[in-house]
Amino acid sequence: FRQGQESKIISYAHKINHGEHPSINSPLTEPQIWKDGTDCMFIDSGLGEHGKPNSEYPQWSSLRYGMDVVNMTKSLYIDIINKYHNTKDIQILIPMKISDLGTIRINDIIQEAVNPPAKGKSQIKLKDRTFRDGDKVIHTINNYDIEVFNGDIGWIQSIEEVSGTAEIKFGDDRVVKYKKIDMMELELAYAITCHKSQGSEFDCVILPIMSQYSRMLYRNLL
């Protein structure tokens, strides 16, 4: 694990690998950990019957504050993390692509929140997906013609709506010109699957764990 010697991520990961249950602090009950350098936190968005008054949920549950796991994820991505940590390199990791709470739906939710349609903002629609200026995207197959490969993540710098072309800037500061046919190889990347993230590094990761992912919830996922 590429972390500092005092990283909680390392100790928690070793416990999980050994089948032990780590005791991970929650910022809902210990808000000071947002500022004290703690690098791994756990926020519970379940436990208990839904539909109760917020005040009846435990203090450590996000439901007490009116936020289920999707809204909590959105709030963390858009607002809370940037409030305490100066980073834009935030990645949501999801075990599954296709489900009610898979990467496709979470990407649509985050895109609508951080990069909605606006007057003067170019966008292009390709089948069931819409890309806009400023969107975070991931290339999904190897494309040797433009030298972009499976798992490369970048940001759309500009879109030409008439021709269906775009310019995308990747992490190594390369700007690549995409034809419309190349755009078909892209997906939104606010949320990506854990599988797609292998080999990548991020300043901050949000990892929602929900019962809908039950067939993927094994120790080695964490």
Task: Show where each model-derived region lies.
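Conserved helicase motor core of P-loop NTPases
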Residues: 1-137, 143-146
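Flexible loop/turn segments at secondary-structure boundaries
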Residues: 3-5, 99-102, 145-147, 162-165, ...
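Extended aliphatic helical segments
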Residues: 69-70, 114, 137-138, 148, ...
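Hydrophobic alpha-helix feature that most strongly marks membrane-spanning transmembrane helices
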Residues: 111, 115, 142, 161, ...
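A contiguous, basic/glycine-rich beta-loop/short-helix subdomain that forms a polymer-engagement track
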Residues: 133, 140, 181-185
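Glycine-centered loop/turn motifs
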Residues: 134, 150-153
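C-terminal accessory regions
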Residues: 152-222
